[in-house]
Amino acid sequence: MPKRVLKGAAKRAREAKHARDAAKARRLSSFLNVRLNQEHIPHEILPNSASDDKLLDRPVTGADLFAPSSGPSSNSVYPSLLQEEYFWNYFWQTYHVSLCPILDDAQFKQHYQSLLIADGKGRKPSALVDIVVAACMQYHISTLPLGSQSGLVEGKDASVAGRWHYWRGQTLLTYELESLSISTLQCHVLCSIYLCGGSFHNMMDTAMAQAVRTAYILGLHRDLPSTLPEAKREMRRRLWWTVYFMDTRATMKLGRSFMLSESHSMPALCIDSLRVAASSGSTFVPADEDMTWLSFNLRQITLCRTFRAAYTSFHNTDFHLQEGQPIWDRPDALQAGAEIIAKHIPSLDAWCDSVPDALKLKRQDSNSRPFSTDGARVVLELSAPEWLQRQRMLLENTYHHVCVNLFRSMICFPYQPASQVHISENSLPGELATRCAAHAIALTKLTHQVLEETSLLDGWHEAFYCQWDAVMTLIGFVLAYPGSGTVTLEAKSAIHLAIAVSENFGFKFAVGTSASKIVQGLCAKSETLTANEYASAYIGASTQNANIYRIYGGQICGVIDWQNS
């Protein structure tokens, strides 16, 4: 590809990223411009990531996209067959058991063996194998320190490791457009995971759209007759509900509408019984009599259903706002929104109670309980299998992440000077804003402890993005409630922990380092604004007050742009 064409494509990629985050970055930069009398460019408060340009180029060596792997001495950019097996073996202990149980372990290995060429020097093309290898390369290389990362990244960031396998898999998928299969759907789901890890969020969204349409075309929204084999029925259910989960996660991440709608035509939820787990193709030992390795996936799905019910109810409500008016300009509308969200809190509590004890993270403080936001340190049972430890941690992480996204719309700027601001116990929006901050603090403390004491989250890109979401929420909370209240002080402390978390991730992939620098810069600006009692400065004129109010209403404290949702 000509160099200038590549540069132009890279520039468009950066602009696309900035367009995606415009509802956040533009408002925050505008606010800082006004309050600090300094120019802040929107993209300067977004982490630099692999999506800037590093997935746009092609192999420097081994330009034949379909050249078979031929051993460690080959000049091909693809790993040898032994190296491929080394990478895809990670899949079963990571993505398979902790994110997307959509492959049959035994069937995949049989499929891989069937691809091997007789002379043992290569294998036949397979989109599914390529994308599994790409995802596992991205994960594993992201667990290594920057100085120890393999030459397979070719000087690029670990988040784009495996990109040649990804591109080859994408090319192979084009041949399946008119002959869709279960394998096609599996590829689209895994592509979205790979793209999300590399922070290619628009491409991830497109991959998820393809997955949703493919799932409908394959009829996965309808259950198979009970006369067919249970293992086949359960695999189809797991595929459907994994697409459902990934669609929900994309909505939380991007603030866009759901692509897969709730309807009367939905398959039954997955079964996590010992019998079904035994026929799934995987051989993980049950952790308890009422819990198998499939229980984690089932609990994630039921949590997503609880979130979607609350999210849909809130965002489908007509608050009778004027054109261009955000909910944060109308205390009565904000109160009405808070009442809608509050109705779903018992459902979240019921979900916590429904989780099997074997999937819960115990606390070092015997008076604390799982999923709480009291700040108690968790017990990391290092003698438990790694897959089970990761499931426990990720389930609680997901719960806090869901609550942050659900309650964040209640954080807004007050009308009175900062010196008079406090979170009133009698204010329902204030209570939910406090809940939001508490969950962001809990997520941050949990992530920090796990990274400090274990390697469970090393290379886990989604944990980094959940942490980024939490710390930006905390910064918004501190700016909205800049007093010296207990929650604000705890939020400030958690922000500093979040910086340490980003730096930890930054030892493995560059976006972590970039995020750390951005948060440190925003902390400094927050301290400056607080010291100058910035809130009292913008009360002077009603028009100015409204503008500042809107900036934060949609920027940090609301995931989506209300007027364009």
Curated annotation (Swiss-Prot):
Domain of life: Eukaryota
A Pfam family reported for this protein in Swiss-Prot or TrEMBL: Fungal_trans
Keywords: Nucleus, Transcription, Transcription regulation
BP-aspect Gene Ontology terms: DNA-templated transcription
GO cellular component, one term: nucleus
Intracellular or extracellular location(s): Nucleus
Keyword Nucleus: yes
Region (Fungal transcription factor domain), start-end ranges: 204-273
GO molecular function: DNA-binding transcription factor activity, RNA polymerase II-specific; RNA polymerase II cis-regulatory region sequence-specific DNA binding; zinc ion binding
Known role: Transcription factor that regulates specifically the 4'-methoxyviridicatin/aspoquinolone biosynthesis cluster.
Listed name of the protein: Transcription factor asqA
Organism, as annotated: Emericella nidulans (strain FGSC A4 / ATCC 38163 / CBS 112.46 / NRRL 194 / M139)
Native organism taxonomy: Eukaryota, Fungi, Dikarya, Ascomycota, Pezizomycotina
